[in-house]
UniProtKB/Swiss-Prot annotation:
Residues that coordinate or bind a divalent metal cation: 164, 209, 264
Pathway listed: Cofactor biosynthesis; pyridoxine 5'-phosphate biosynthesis; pyridoxine 5'-phosphate from D-erythrose 4-phosphate: step 4/5
Binding note for cofactor: Binds 1 divalent metal cation per subunit. Can use ions such as Zn(2+), Mg(2+) or Co(2+).
Record's subcellular location: Cytoplasm
Top-rank taxon, per record: Bacteria
A biological process from GO: pyridoxal phosphate biosynthetic process
Alphabetized UniProt keyword annotations: Cobalt, Cytoplasm, Magnesium, Metal-binding, NAD, NADP, Oxidoreductase, Pyridoxine biosynthesis, Zinc
Primary role: Catalyzes the NAD(P)-dependent oxidation of 4-(phosphooxy)-L-threonine (HTP) into 2-amino-3-oxo-4-(phosphooxy)butyric acid which spontaneously decarboxylates to form 3-amino-2-oxopropyl phosphate (AHAP).
Stated name of the protein: 4-hydroxythreonine-4-phosphate dehydrogenase
Catalytic activity: 4-(phosphooxy)-L-threonine + NAD(+) = 3-amino-2-oxopropyl phosphate + CO2 + NADH
Amino acid sequence: MTQRIAITPGEPAGVGPDLIITIAQQDWPVEMVVIASKALLQERSKALSLPLTIIDYDQHAPAKSQKSGSLTVLDVELTEPCVPGTLNSANGSYVVETLRIASEKNISGEFDAIVTGPVHKGLINKAGIAFSGHTEYFATQANCSDVVMMLATKGLRVALVTTHIPLAYVSKAITYERLQKVTRILHKDLQEKFGIKSPKIYACGINPHAGEDGHLGREEIEIMEPAFAELRADGIDIIGPLPADTIFQEKYLAEADAILAMYHDQGLPVLKYKGFGSSVNITLGLPFIRTSVDHGTALELAGKGTADSGSFIEAMNNAINLASNK
């Protein structure tokens, strides 16, 4: 059966629409249903001088693989016309509406996965809509109290205990309960979505040198080690906490199915250095599959045909592979 993958371009003034039109210039073994403004896609394809045939989405028709130069589109009107590279807060509600439709139709089983383009969080909030990120939004839509943000590239997966919070709040956010929940979700999805029978997880400490026996902080001793001990007792193979400045050595990465980082800028700089342009964001713990690009809106590139589509292609391929494991 042909898979049906929902795609949201994200910020209309950014490179999301460009990338979708670019990757549509090849055949795909799935139906790519873009939840977006048809007019926006048509205008952007002309700006890029790329051919585009739009097929109106019919949920009652059987899914068909996507042919080169075509996109299936579920039309959502822009609030106001869009100029590439120029933000307009009036379209913040449009962006959120595309995400709402995508999540609802994935929860219902109409789609097999969601692939999301980059959004501008500040603009959505400026529009009066509280929004801290895709991960948190989809968790709310799916009524999930706990989800996990993981980024992946060739040879490295990094999951985060905390995501989009100020660094000053990180230490208090890393609790015994949070470590338990995040690690269990990571372990479960590595098994069920990635087909890894016995996942091995390496965990970073939070302090320099993982606290150095409590001399540089006691979170490792008082919170992390007891949490990991209970996880091991339940059969979860987790190693750590280890110093974050040494955990990314090849000798560890060769064994690790995932690295568990305590905060956003502890784990992601290494991953993006290793695979920028070819890494993908994956949300774990949702009742549906969601992948995304690993970059921002790149407003300065919108409509110019110079944006790199590598991460979007990886996000698509990961979504297809994960959906095949369901």
